[in-house]
Structures are given as C-alpha cells and as structure tokens.
Amino acid sequence: PITDLTIKDNSLIVATQGRSLWMIDDLTVLHQLPNSNKDPYLFKPKPTYRLRGNGGKNSLTMGTNKPNGVEVHFYIPSYEKGSDTVELSFHDEKGNEIKKFSTSDDDNKLEVKDGGNVFVWDYKYPGAEKFEGMVMWSASLNGAKAVPGTYQVKLSVNNFESQNSFEILKSPTSESSVDQMREQFNFVNQINKTISNAHQSIKKIRKIKLKLNEFLTNFSDNSDAENIIKKANFLVDSLSTVENALYQTKNESRQDPLNFPIKLTNKLGHIANLVTINDFPPTDQDKRLMMELSEKINKEIEVFNKLMTSDVSEFNLSFKKLQLDYLIN
C-alpha cells in the first residue's frame, strides 16, 4: 500500500509499505497542457541530470528505473504511417543540430502513435562511421555525451514546427567539473572524426577492389590487357595494404580478435572506450597515444588518397584507351 505522497523537483514521489520510494512521473507535462488538442504540441522538457549507467528493467520482481536521458513529451493528434513525417531534432544553445530522429529514417527511427508520446535522448552526439561486417574488440564508436548546459529540441510534423529549450544539469554525485566533461567531450569527438575518416576510406577501398576483381575475372585471358592487368593487381595489393593497416580484415565473428591482433582504428576506439568509463578528462598518456595513433591513421589515408589521384586515375585512362567492353556477355 501507498503510505505517503510528496512532490520533489516537479516529480511525484510515492512511499510504499515495503520501505520503498518510487518516482512516479514528470508532473511538468500536466502543468503545460494546451487548451486545444487539435494541433501537435511539444512540451518543454524538465531540467535533467546527466547521470551514468542506463535505465532498464532487470526482472519481473524489480522496479523499472527512470530512463537515463532527456525525456521529451509531445502530442500528435493523428498519425498516418506513410503519409505523415514526424521529426524530433536536438540542437545546442547556438542552434547547431546535434542529432535528428524521424519516422522516415531507419537508422535514427522515431516511433510515433496517436496521442501522447515520449522520447528519451541519451545525451549522445553522432558516433564514428561504421561499415558492414565490422568487428571491434573493446572499442567504443559511440558519440560523445552532451556537456551540461542549455539545449534546444524541435518538433516537426509535416509543415508544423515547434521548439523548446531545456537544461542538462551536472550530476550532484559526479566529481568532475563541467570544464573537465567538456575536455572529454572534445577528446572523444576528435577520436570519432579520425575513425570516421578511416572507415570512409575503407568503404571506398572495398568498392574499388570489388570493381578491380570483377575486371581481373573478366579480362584475365585478354592478351591486349596485359599491362592494365598488372596495374589492377598492383592496385588491389596496395589498397589491401592500407585496409589491413587500418582494420583487422580477418575478423568475422566477435571472438576472432582473440586470434588476430587489433589494428589502428580499433586501438583508437579502445582509448575512447576507456576514457568514457567516467566523467573525467583524458590523461596525458591518453592524449599522447591518441595523437600517435591518429598520425599513423592519417598517413595510411594519405597513401590511399595518392593511389586515388594517381594510380586509379591512370588505370581508368588505360581502360578507356583499350576500349574494352565493360559488360561481358
């Protein structure tokens, strides 16, 4: 049975006979109820503490934790899947977009129903680029967590738009200062930018190698293409060298890194994984290792870019001069 009720920070707190305290709900939604329910409505999120861990439910005999993130309540009078587009975007204090979720986006999907809706933003900025079949060992490609401060949320329903500001607060249990959190934020963003550049290069490398291998299969017995076949083999080998330096291409399952050593982007992602265990800034050793790995990654990307501007371009010119049929019967 419920033995007591009180309000704390605009949340309803309930005490039960089992000596438990429960935070039932956010009462600010009731304080902001609109006069009409004909139009979409975006409620102003209440100030949210940036906490560690995540909300969840472990078993049927345990209570459900409050979601770890900014709870955004919004109202949609009616939603027709396929014809209506609903978007929820988060912005910094200057209005720069951080992340957008949409009913039409498969990656950042926004689930919507008629009536009241709630979405929880986990404070995170976009993470590093990924590619199909990628296997990493103890690495984080997650986005950096927003630093305590003022932010904006925007709701778009077809031609309707509304926005509100909200506050992310420093957790009273955190021993880090906001400046230290900001230093970690910038550090993780820098890591993710370097990893993204490398993984974008890997995607391009794999597309080029696919085309080159198709060429070698189709024209291996063409005596007129002997020189260009040598160029193709050289390109495949050179591109593979870059790819293998950036990423462990032998990995196919989650346990494969036990047998094959991790490569550059995995090592850099591992630093991000360690740094984000808490709210503290990176150590001097973290910074030095990050710079060392980033330099090695950038050198491999430079090699790839040179191959693109010289050898790949030369291959394309040679292919055109031979007037080879691209499509083989």
PLM region descriptions:
Residues 29-53, 165-197:
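Low-complexity, Pro/Ser/Thr- and charge-rich linker/hinge segments at domain boundaries
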Residues 127-131, 156-164:
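Short acidic/polar inter-strand loop motif in beta-rich domains
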Residues 47-87, 91-92, 118-120, 181, ...:
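Contiguous beta-strand segments within globular domains
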Residues 85-102, 155:
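Extended low-complexity, serine/threonine- and proline-enriched intrinsically disordered segments
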